[in-house]
Amino acid sequence: MILVAVGANLPGPWGAHPVDTCRRAVDEIARIPGLRIQAVSAWYRSAPVPASDQPDYANGVLLLSGKADPAVLLAQLQDIERKGGRVRGVLNAARTLDLDIIDIDGLVRDGPDPVLPHPRAHQRPFVLLPLRDVAPGWIEPRLGRNVTLLLADLRGGCGEVDAPVDWPVQYR
């Protein structure tokens, strides 16, 4: 099981709305040899973290099957980010596309990049809510806690995350 988080909060070359960019990123990820998309979460709207005057983000998670070398997959995702207009610069800056590897088959890896599982995924409801859509039984490999318990740990202090009716999409 491979989990990849997809997010955006700026228009980019693939669309005027962040969800358009996220959907196109899903199509691009589907073209990675050796991987198959099993599920795509609903698209959730979330406030930027840390809080700022940036536009809200669209966030989702993909469940993939297949085999992936972590460093190779990271390079492939960063290439897709560049195609989607991502320019790396200031930490936590607004972006046209953000793709993060959350987990690859429960692998625990401290480096080189990517660190797995994603070191902050368990602290982010905008990752955990869509992750629960596609992998409700997922257990964070370092903590040994499932996604439902991780979400319960965050209640009441991690910002607003909404799933508006017009944002969800099913992958074709």
Where are these regions (language model features)?
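N-terminal beta1-alpha1 ligand-phosphate binding loop
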Residues: 1-35, 40-45
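Short, surface-exposed loop/turn motifs that are enriched in glycine and acidic residues
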Residues: 14-15, 63-66, 130
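Flexible, gly/pro- and Lys/Arg-enriched active-site loops
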Residues: 49-56, 71-74, 79-172
